[in-house]
Structures are given as C-alpha cells and as structure tokens.
Amino acid sequence: MASRAGPRAAGTDGSDFQHRERVAMHYQMSVTLKYEIKKLIYVHLVIWLLLVAKMSVGHLRLLSHDQVAMPYQWEYPYLLSVVPSLLGLLSFPRNNISYLVLSMISMGLFSIAPLIYGSMEMFPAAQQLYRHGKAYRFLFGFSAVSVMYLVLVLAVQVHAWQLYYSKKLLDSWFTSTQEKKRK
C-alpha cells in the first residue's frame, strides 16, 4: 500500500501481525476433533442404516431366505448403537462434557460389546466356511458370514477412532475448563 507522499505507510507491509491475538490451541483442536467425530458418526449412521435395511428385509420376508439371511443375534443390540452417536452430536454445540462422557461409555456398551459378541457368534460359521467351504447363510449370493465380518471390521474401526477422537476432545475441553478456573 503506497501513500501519495512517498514510501509505504508504516505497519502496512505485513510486518504488524505479531501483536495480533491468536486462537488458543485447544480451541483449534476442539473444532478439528468435532469435525472428525462428525464424519465418523455419519459413516456409522450409513452402516447402521444398511444393517436396519438388511434386518427389515429379513424379517418382513421381502426377499427369499436364499438371498437375504435372517439377522444374527448381535445385530439386535447393535441397533442401539445410534444412541451414543446422538449423544455425541448433542454434546458439540455447548461443549457439554457430561454428554460426551455418556456417549463414550454407552459406545462401549451399545457398540463395541455387540461387535465383540458378534465376532464370537459368527466364528464357528466362519471357521466352517474356511475349513470346508460350506456356507449356510447368504446375502445376495455371497456368504453372509464373510459379508458381516467385513461390516464388523469396518464398524470396529469406526467406533475405535470415534472413541479415540472423543477422548482427545474431552482432554481438550478439560484443558479449556481448567484454564478458565485458574483465571
């Protein structure tokens, strides 16, 4: 920016940024972690909706059992896994620590525990498929145990990352709370 009188006016050459305030690191981290958790929640909702669709088709007998198998037992309690995701979303607007803690605890109960049970429930069928090449449940021509193990592995990864980011977000919120109490 040049002035009519001659050289550039003082402070307009871009060297005046050092006195400006910066956003605290825990606020930047909070925004980033909220965004990552929201992405994971949306991926979880897609998995959840696919599971609901599969269960609905199986129970309502819209297709024959040769195409869509009846649901495994672990799929019923996993339907409650949408509750931790909703609690997590509710905790974001006002940085509500208690909702985030409830979300993390209920994620273990409603998301991780059914997935662990599901891996144990489907293991004999997977073992039989691996050893003898026989499958008794099918999803559109594919072995149901293979497809459901893929879904299970994806869901475990989504929930593990969601727990990891939630813990980091909780630490970030505690940092900002402790700084406010010191002042």
From Swiss-Prot:
**InterPro entries for the chain:** Jagunal
**Chain positions with Phosphoserine modification:** S3
Question: Subcellular localization, per the record?
Answer: Endoplasmic reticulum membrane
One GO biological-process annotation of the entry reads: neutrophil differentiation
Mark the transmembrane ranges: 40-60, 72-92, 97-117, 138-158
- Topology term for the membrane: Multi-pass membrane protein
Cytoplasmic-facing ranges: 1-39, 93-96, 159-183
Q: Which key words are in the record?
A: Endoplasmic reticulum, Immunity, Membrane, Phosphoprotein, Protein transport, Transmembrane, Transmembrane helix, Transport
Q: Name one Pfam family in it.
A: Jagunal
Parts of the chain on the Lumenal side:
61-71, 118-137
Q: Which GO terms describe its cellular component?
A: endoplasmic reticulum; endoplasmic reticulum membrane
KW Nucleotide-binding (keyword) present: no
Q: What is its main location?
A: endoplasmic reticulum
Spell out the subunit comment.
Interacts with COPA, COPB2 and COPG2.
What does the protein in this record do? Answer: Endoplasmic reticulum transmembrane protein involved in vesicle-mediated transport, which is required for neutrophil function. Required for vesicle-mediated transport; it is however unclear whether it is involved in early secretory pathway or intracellular protein transport.
Record-stated family: Belongs to the jagunal family.
> Which PANTHER family would you find in this protein's record?
PROTEIN JAGUNAL HOMOLOG 1
Protein name stated in the entry? Protein jagunal homolog 1
